[in-house]
Amino acid sequence: MPIQVLPPQLANQIAAGEVVERPASVVKELVENSLDAGATRVDIDIERGGAKLIRIRDNGCGIKKEELALALARHATSKIASLDDLEAIISLGFRGEALASISSVSRLTLTSRTAEQAEAWQAYAEGRDMDVTVKPAAHPVGTTLEVLDLFYNTPARRKFMRTEKTEFNHIDEIIRRIALARFDVTLNLSHNGKLVRQYRAVAKDGQKERRLGAICGTPFLEQALAIEWQHGDLTLRGWVADPNHTTTALTEIQYCYVNGRMMRDRLINHAIRQACEDKLGADQQPAFVLYLEIDPHQVDVNVHPAKHEVRFHQSRLVHDFIYQGVLSVLQQQTETTLPLEDIAPAPRHVPENRIAAGRNHFAVPAEPTAAREPATPRYSGGASGGNGGRQSAGGWPHAQPGYQKQQGEVYRALLQTPTTSPAPEAVAPALDGHSQSFGRVLTIVCGDCALLEHAGTIQLLSLPVAERWLRQAQLTPGQSPVCAQPLLIPLRLKVSADEKAALQKAQSLLGELGIEFQSDAQHVTIRAVPLPLRQQNLQILIPELIGYLAQQTTFATVNIAQWIARNVQSEHPQWSMAQAISLLADVERLCPQLVKAPPGGLLQPVDLHSAMNALKHE
């Protein structure tokens, strides 16, 4: 058979195979066109589940007479005009294929009128070449599309249509999703001449919740937790049901929208599931209605024929943003249920941990008190039995968020005890009203050292060494194991018999460090790592860690944490002032003992006296 150009109707029918799956697909495409036209009211009339009639009427801007024929042509659209528009799509439709595809498998009639026109015009396509006929009609401002006898000329497609009830249920679900996306639009759905759904337009938040209850049901509304989460160009809002009270019926409510477009995105669902997994059973699913707003340049919606999926340019950032947003709401819900007697009273003044950046001249001074308790963090230091091989002698004292009042006198006495450090000149003295600090960052030297000033002395601090100690503190478990962060894509590695035996022997300790894995005959699958390792190249780091464990005869969490801290790659090949200040603030908060007794290689005093004497003798 020679190569030939397909007739327009056949080409459109082929395209319809991707766009028009069932009557619900037609309703989705046509209602989205109405929304793009600025409609505030859309009436959907269905007969026999959409097989006989689908009528969509709106009060949008309408289509001009001279554009009606183009509206039924392939690749004709008013949504985009250039590649730049395609890379930043803000409309629901943009391909210009829907009307042409639908008209090729049905008897479609398009009637429209703009506000500038005195009369409406009607267009329909027919014949092998899909010739468009335009004639006058009576119609208010807006557009009406009638789709009769869907799949009448493609018997194979019509044979696969389900029962009238099933097809209408799919249409009903599409309208529910659209109603959740656009609270400002009135949607009326009728079936066989009977009004089935009526979603009135609302504007205020209280009215939005009533419409949410009408769509998703009262049980969901009663358990819904509101979300408002923002970071840069990312915004997450909506509702998620309390996982502690999620029932089987609620798990069917899973609606997510990206820039107002309904989505079934696996990345979004995984982030939400991960945030709720601690409170959900193995057979439970989270219930949510969430809206993600993102810069259109950072998302590609042209990756699925029906536009059900998107591709994010920074998928890890979006995943973690959604995860943190949902998790923060669930944590706030948990905190609000705590009994009041278990909550310690708030302090009168909380000193800022900002010595590295300099004193805040705009801070409100604390009220004078007779004796202020020092703001020294509490940390555990003694050995405890039954810790599964964890060593505390010579280990890392893990910082805690604060200390109880009954321990205040003990720590006050400890702070008054004279120090016996062999190198007192390397210890930074405490500052009034603040916890001990390395001092103020003056500048960055050679890209990886910070020049510090404190109490009239100048010191050089190695930023990579400080970062390594901070990583070790973050990786060393305290009273509870390090929080594990599940991987979006688990890492599967082949291991030898010795490596597998070492992993099984150290599995409990690795679990305390936030590293979770499963092993089979010759492979190990890493499923979770601690937060400091999320941005590392795990395909290199994890095999090296397994090799290190295979060479050890005994295991301790401190030694494993030290090895990981020394072998992770720094995120800052060249340090900036802001990064150095942030690092020192974290080190002072999590590793206060480094300020009291800096280890070798961290701090080096700069002798100003010899330099000043040399200048004076010039």
Curated annotation (Swiss-Prot):
InterPro entries: DNA_mismatch_repair_CS, DNA_mismatch_repair_MutL, DNA_mismatch_S5_2-like, HATPase_C_sf, MutL/Mlh/PMS, MutL/Mlh/Pms-like, MutL_C, MutL_C_dimsub. Residues 382-392 have a biased composition (Gly residues). Residues 367-381 have a biased composition (Low complexity). Transmembrane segments: none annotated. One of its GO terms (molecular function) is ATP binding. Belongs to the DNA mismatch repair MutL/HexB family. PANTHER family: DNA MISMATCH REPAIR PROTEIN MLH, PMS, MUTL, DNA MISMATCH REPAIR PROTEIN MLH1. This is DNA mismatch repair protein MutL. It comes from Salmonella paratyphi B (strain ATCC BAA-1250 / SPB7). The lineage of its organism: Bacteria, Pseudomonadati, Pseudomonadota, Gammaproteobacteria, Enterobacterales.
